């Protein structure tokens, strides 16, 4: 009988989006590869996020999925080519960590010897899997829930490693392109997809002078996409000499490197926050309508700021109250400053929840 290290399994992981969800699923990849180093693993992912995984040493390939083309007849030929490719691969395991109709259909079309999904399938995806893994409890963190598929496959869950591998060439490129050296960096992430998860930009701007006055050697890098440029401009005006507005200016891998080289991130509940947790970069996370015990920065939950209001967590994209977003608006820059200082202090161990 072959030892686990000699077993050659061909595996497809389906987790196309979002950034935070993909990052939280990476320990599944790492542990499979550690336990079965001869395995051949592919990851099915939205094209916008593919650069995060392309070149990953644990992957045999990245399968790009154009979500916007899913229902467009003019792209059906391309979709069928993807389907034929899936059928030809003869996967041993198909692991769907997305559990939506699209991913469920592709899990079924892949025709693996064993297909696995999670116990919260939406859009009727439940029928596409041979085995469904239940969430251990209502408050089980997403990372631990994803990892719970591994015992079904005979893969032990014991780990302590960085989820995102170092990219020395890219890191050197970032240092050449931006004035990284000669300063210590705090990264700020003001944007989110949900307006209800966004700490007010004025509060971020008010935080900058507090941190600047107490930390003379630090500068501030403001992260975000093109849509976050207005937020970056407001925050950068708080201290133009020490703020570097990078909103809309970085590729996804470059953003990862900026978070890697920084000593602290202050962030809303959004994808880059999970990148920081994956890299081990200290985080102060600002939560309103969502549940940090399920989706907070993994292994850094003591450093989440969330108010104890009757409506929290509501899990709504829009606030139903007359004073909208009070759950985040009532978090003061002074409170975030105090939490940040504890994270920056060499002997800090206390957090705030």
Where is each model-derived feature located?
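Catalytic machinery of carbohydrate-active enzymes
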Residues: 1-353
